[in-house]
Amino acid sequence: MDINGNAFVVGSGSGIGRACALGLAKGGAKGILIADINLEAANRVATECRGATKYMIEIFERIDYCINCAGIGVQLARNISEADFGEFSRFLQIHVEGTFLLVRSVSAAMQLQELRPIDPTNPGRGGARGSIVTLGSGNSFAAAPHLVQYTAAKHAVLGVTKNAALDNAAHGIRVNCVCPTWVETPMIQSARDGGVEIDSWVKGMVPLGRIATAEEVADTVIFFCSPRSSYATGCGFLLDGGTTLTCHV
Protein backbone atom coordinates (compact mmCIF):
# COMPACT_ATOMS: atom_id res chain seq x y z
CA MET A 1 0.00 0.00 0.00
CA ASP A 2 2.85 2.38 -0.88
CA ILE A 3 4.36 2.23 2.59
CA ASN A 4 8.05 3.04 2.25
CA GLY A 5 8.79 5.54 5.02
CA ASN A 6 9.63 5.36 8.72
CA ALA A 7 6.96 4.46 11.26
CA PHE A 8 6.67 5.30 14.96
CA VAL A 9 4.21 2.92 16.67
CA VAL A 10 3.19 3.45 20.29
CA GLY A 11 1.43 0.69 22.20
CA SER A 12 2.57 -2.12 19.93
CA GLY A 13 3.18 -4.85 22.47
CA SER A 14 0.00 -6.73 21.63
CA GLY A 15 -3.37 -6.44 19.93
CA ILE A 16 -3.93 -3.72 17.36
CA GLY A 17 -0.54 -2.08 17.86
CA ARG A 18 1.28 -5.33 17.22
CA ALA A 19 -0.80 -5.95 14.10
CA CYS A 20 0.03 -2.43 12.87
CA ALA A 21 3.76 -2.92 13.39
CA LEU A 22 3.72 -6.27 11.58
CA GLY A 23 1.54 -4.88 8.78
CA LEU A 24 3.87 -1.93 8.24
CA ALA A 25 6.86 -4.26 8.11
CA LYS A 26 5.16 -6.52 5.57
CA GLY A 27 4.06 -3.47 3.61
CA GLY A 28 7.62 -2.28 3.10
CA ALA A 29 8.22 0.33 5.81
CA LYS A 30 11.84 1.45 5.74
CA GLY A 31 12.14 1.63 9.52
CA ILE A 32 9.87 1.00 12.51
CA LEU A 33 10.36 2.23 16.06
CA ILE A 34 8.18 0.45 18.60
CA ALA A 35 7.58 2.35 21.83
CA ASP A 36 5.59 1.38 24.90
CA ILE A 37 5.33 4.64 26.78
CA ASN A 38 4.04 4.36 30.34
CA LEU A 39 0.98 6.57 29.99
CA GLU A 40 -0.02 5.98 33.60
CA ALA A 41 3.05 7.80 34.92
CA ALA A 42 1.53 11.27 34.66
CA ASN A 43 4.66 13.14 35.69
CA ARG A 44 6.78 11.40 33.05
CA VAL A 45 4.51 11.06 30.02
CA ALA A 46 5.46 14.36 28.35
CA THR A 47 9.17 13.64 28.87
CA GLU A 48 8.82 10.08 27.54
CA CYS A 49 6.92 11.31 24.45
CA ARG A 50 9.57 13.92 23.69
CA GLY A 51 12.36 11.44 24.33
CA ALA A 52 10.88 8.75 22.08
CA THR A 53 10.23 11.29 19.32
CA LYS A 54 13.79 12.62 19.58
CA TYR A 55 15.18 9.08 19.46
CA MET A 56 13.11 8.28 16.38
CA ILE A 57 14.52 11.33 14.58
CA GLU A 58 18.08 10.50 15.65
CA ILE A 59 17.82 6.93 14.36
CA PHE A 60 15.74 7.38 11.19
CA GLU A 61 16.09 11.15 10.53
CA ARG A 62 12.33 11.61 10.01
CA ILE A 63 8.93 10.27 11.05
CA ASP A 64 6.65 9.51 8.13
CA TYR A 65 3.91 7.69 10.04
CA CYS A 66 2.95 7.86 13.70
CA ILE A 67 0.36 5.47 15.13
CA ASN A 68 -0.88 5.63 18.72
CA CYS A 69 -2.51 2.40 19.86
CA ALA A 70 -1.88 2.73 23.59
CA GLY A 71 -4.92 2.34 25.78
CA ILE A 72 -6.75 0.36 28.43
CA GLY A 73 -10.08 -1.47 28.53
CA VAL A 74 -12.94 -1.30 31.00
CA GLN A 75 -12.64 -3.93 33.68
CA LEU A 76 -15.61 -2.88 35.78
CA ALA A 77 -18.73 -1.60 34.01
CA ARG A 78 -20.88 0.60 36.26
CA ASN A 79 -23.93 2.79 36.04
CA ILE A 80 -23.13 6.52 36.09
CA SER A 81 -24.58 6.71 39.62
CA GLU A 82 -21.93 4.28 40.84
CA ALA A 83 -19.02 5.19 38.54
CA ASP A 84 -15.63 5.51 40.18
CA PHE A 85 -14.00 8.92 39.76
CA GLY A 86 -10.50 7.50 40.05
CA GLU A 87 -11.10 5.13 37.15
CA PHE A 88 -12.75 7.92 35.14
CA SER A 89 -9.68 10.12 35.64
CA ARG A 90 -7.37 7.24 34.73
CA PHE A 91 -9.13 6.73 31.40
CA LEU A 92 -8.85 10.43 30.57
CA GLN A 93 -5.19 10.43 31.53
CA ILE A 94 -4.19 7.41 29.47
CA HIS A 95 -6.39 7.84 26.41
CA VAL A 96 -6.74 11.61 26.15
CA GLU A 97 -3.67 13.12 27.78
CA GLY A 98 -1.49 10.39 26.28
CA THR A 99 -2.86 11.03 22.79
CA PHE A 100 -2.49 14.79 23.18
CA LEU A 101 1.11 14.63 24.41
CA LEU A 102 2.21 12.20 21.71
CA VAL A 103 0.47 14.06 18.89
CA ARG A 104 1.91 17.35 20.14
CA SER A 105 5.45 15.97 20.23
CA VAL A 106 5.27 14.27 16.83
CA SER A 107 3.57 17.26 15.20
CA ALA A 108 6.42 19.52 16.30
CA ALA A 109 8.97 17.11 14.81
CA MET A 110 7.07 16.57 11.56
CA GLN A 111 6.61 20.30 11.00
CA LEU A 112 10.40 20.64 10.77
CA GLN A 113 10.76 17.88 8.19
CA GLU A 114 11.26 18.26 4.47
CA LEU A 115 8.05 18.46 2.45
CA ARG A 116 8.11 15.54 0.03
CA PRO A 117 5.88 15.02 -3.02
CA ILE A 118 3.11 12.52 -2.38
CA ASP A 119 3.23 11.26 -5.96
CA PRO A 120 5.97 12.62 -8.24
CA THR A 121 3.92 11.57 -11.28
CA ASN A 122 0.87 13.51 -10.07
CA PRO A 123 1.88 16.96 -8.75
CA GLY A 124 -1.76 17.79 -8.05
CA ARG A 125 -1.58 15.65 -4.93
CA GLY A 126 0.83 18.10 -3.34
CA GLY A 127 3.40 17.30 -0.70
CA ALA A 128 3.48 15.70 2.74
CA ARG A 129 5.56 15.84 5.88
CA GLY A 130 3.86 12.94 7.61
CA SER A 131 0.71 11.17 8.71
CA ILE A 132 -0.55 10.59 12.25
CA VAL A 133 -3.21 8.02 13.11
CA THR A 134 -4.90 7.83 16.50
CA LEU A 135 -7.12 5.06 17.77
CA GLY A 136 -10.66 5.97 18.69
CA SER A 137 -13.64 3.66 19.06
CA GLY A 138 -17.26 3.24 18.16
CA ASN A 139 -17.64 4.99 21.52
CA SER A 140 -16.09 8.08 19.92
CA PHE A 141 -19.54 8.54 18.32
CA ALA A 142 -22.05 6.80 20.57
CA ALA A 143 -22.49 5.93 24.21
CA ALA A 144 -22.80 2.46 25.69
CA PRO A 145 -24.46 1.58 29.01
CA HIS A 146 -22.20 1.62 32.06
CA LEU A 147 -19.10 2.75 30.15
CA VAL A 148 -18.99 6.49 30.88
CA GLN A 149 -15.21 6.48 31.41
CA TYR A 150 -14.54 4.87 28.04
CA THR A 151 -17.14 6.87 26.10
CA ALA A 152 -15.87 10.19 27.48
CA ALA A 153 -12.24 9.31 26.77
CA LYS A 154 -12.84 8.12 23.21
CA HIS A 155 -15.00 11.13 22.33
CA ALA A 156 -12.11 13.30 23.49
CA VAL A 157 -9.53 11.35 21.46
CA LEU A 158 -11.53 12.11 18.32
CA GLY A 159 -11.69 15.77 19.35
CA VAL A 160 -7.92 15.96 19.80
CA THR A 161 -7.49 14.31 16.41
CA LYS A 162 -9.75 16.78 14.62
CA ASN A 163 -8.03 19.81 16.12
CA ALA A 164 -4.59 18.38 15.38
CA ALA A 165 -5.68 17.79 11.78
CA LEU A 166 -6.80 21.40 11.48
CA ASP A 167 -3.61 22.80 13.01
CA ASN A 168 -1.33 20.56 10.94
CA ALA A 169 -3.05 20.83 7.55
CA ALA A 170 -1.00 23.82 6.37
CA HIS A 171 2.19 21.89 7.16
CA GLY A 172 1.33 18.91 4.97
CA ILE A 173 0.61 16.64 7.93
CA ARG A 174 -2.56 14.56 7.98
CA VAL A 175 -4.16 13.37 11.23
CA ASN A 176 -6.94 10.78 11.27
CA CYS A 177 -8.67 8.58 13.81
CA VAL A 178 -9.63 4.94 13.19
CA CYS A 179 -12.63 4.02 15.32
CA PRO A 180 -13.28 0.28 15.61
CA THR A 181 -15.92 -1.29 17.79
CA TRP A 182 -15.20 -4.76 19.13
CA VAL A 183 -11.80 -6.16 18.16
CA GLU A 184 -10.31 -9.49 19.23
CA THR A 185 -7.47 -8.25 21.44
CA PRO A 186 -6.22 -8.75 25.00
CA MET A 187 -8.14 -5.58 25.91
CA ILE A 188 -11.40 -7.22 24.85
CA GLN A 189 -10.55 -10.31 26.87
CA SER A 190 -9.92 -8.02 29.83
CA ALA A 191 -13.39 -6.55 29.35
CA ARG A 192 -14.85 -10.07 29.23
CA ASP A 193 -13.07 -10.85 32.47
CA GLY A 194 -14.68 -7.75 33.96
CA GLY A 195 -18.17 -8.98 33.18
CA VAL A 196 -18.90 -7.21 29.89
CA GLU A 197 -20.97 -9.63 27.78
CA ILE A 198 -19.30 -8.83 24.47
CA ASP A 199 -19.91 -12.03 22.54
CA SER A 200 -23.67 -12.17 23.07
CA TRP A 201 -23.92 -8.48 22.19
CA VAL A 202 -22.00 -8.99 18.95
CA LYS A 203 -24.21 -11.86 17.81
CA GLY A 204 -27.33 -9.75 18.22
CA MET A 205 -26.12 -6.34 17.12
CA VAL A 206 -23.38 -6.60 14.49
CA PRO A 207 -24.66 -7.32 10.95
CA LEU A 208 -21.41 -9.07 10.00
CA GLY A 209 -21.95 -11.28 13.03
CA ARG A 210 -18.46 -11.32 14.46
CA ILE A 211 -15.75 -9.39 16.24
CA ALA A 212 -13.10 -7.75 14.04
CA THR A 213 -9.56 -9.06 13.93
CA ALA A 214 -6.66 -6.84 14.91
CA GLU A 215 -5.30 -7.24 11.39
CA GLU A 216 -8.47 -5.73 9.89
CA VAL A 217 -8.02 -2.64 12.03
CA ALA A 218 -4.32 -2.49 11.14
CA ASP A 219 -5.18 -2.56 7.43
CA THR A 220 -7.37 0.51 7.92
CA VAL A 221 -4.71 2.30 9.96
CA ILE A 222 -2.10 1.60 7.29
CA PHE A 223 -4.44 2.95 4.61
CA PHE A 224 -4.58 6.26 6.48
CA CYS A 225 -0.78 6.26 6.70
CA SER A 226 -0.41 5.64 2.99
CA PRO A 227 -0.57 8.19 0.14
CA ARG A 228 -3.76 6.50 -1.03
CA SER A 229 -5.55 8.55 1.62
CA SER A 230 -3.73 11.77 0.70
CA TYR A 231 -6.91 13.90 0.72
CA ALA A 232 -8.20 12.57 4.04
CA THR A 233 -7.54 14.45 7.26
CA GLY A 234 -9.57 14.95 10.41
CA CYS A 235 -11.56 11.79 9.72
CA GLY A 236 -13.14 9.61 12.35
CA PHE A 237 -13.35 6.37 10.38
CA LEU A 238 -15.95 4.06 11.91
CA LEU A 239 -15.03 0.39 11.54
CA ASP A 240 -17.98 -1.40 13.09
CA GLY A 241 -19.09 -4.34 10.95
CA GLY A 242 -22.28 -2.47 10.13
CA THR A 243 -23.36 -1.97 13.74
CA THR A 244 -24.61 1.58 13.19
CA LEU A 245 -26.51 0.80 9.97
CA THR A 246 -29.71 0.29 11.91
CA CYS A 247 -31.33 1.66 15.04
CA HIS A 248 -31.43 -0.93 17.82
CA VAL A 249 -34.36 -0.17 20.11
UniProtKB/Swiss-Prot annotation:
Enzyme kind, highest EC tier: oxidoreductase
Residues the record marks as active site: 150, 154
Enzyme Commission code: 1.1.1.-
Pathway of action: Secondary metabolite biosynthesis
Record carries keyword NADP: yes
Alphabetized UniProt keyword annotations: NADP, Oxidoreductase
Family label: Belongs to the short-chain dehydrogenases/reductases (SDR) family.
Annotated function: Short-chain dehydrogenase; part of the gene cluster that mediates the biosynthesis of virensols and trichoxide, fungal natural products that contain or are derived from a salicylaldehyde core. The pathway begins with the synthesis of the reduced chain in virensol C by the highly reducing polyketide synthase virA via condensation of one acetate and 8 malonate units. VirA has interesting programming rules since the first 2 ketides are fully reduced, the 3 following ketides undergo beta-dehydration, and the last 3 ketides are only reduced to beta-hydroxys to yield the trihydroxy portion.
Cross-referenced PANTHER family: DEHYDROGENASES, SHORT CHAIN, SHORT-CHAIN DEHYDROGENASE_REDUCTASE FAMILY, PUTATIVE (AFU_ORTHOLOGUE AFUA_5G14340)-RELATED
Protein name in the entry: Short-chain dehydrogenase virB
UniProt organism field: Hypocrea virens (strain Gv29-8 / FGSC 10586)
Lineage: Eukaryota, Fungi, Dikarya, Ascomycota, Pezizomycotina
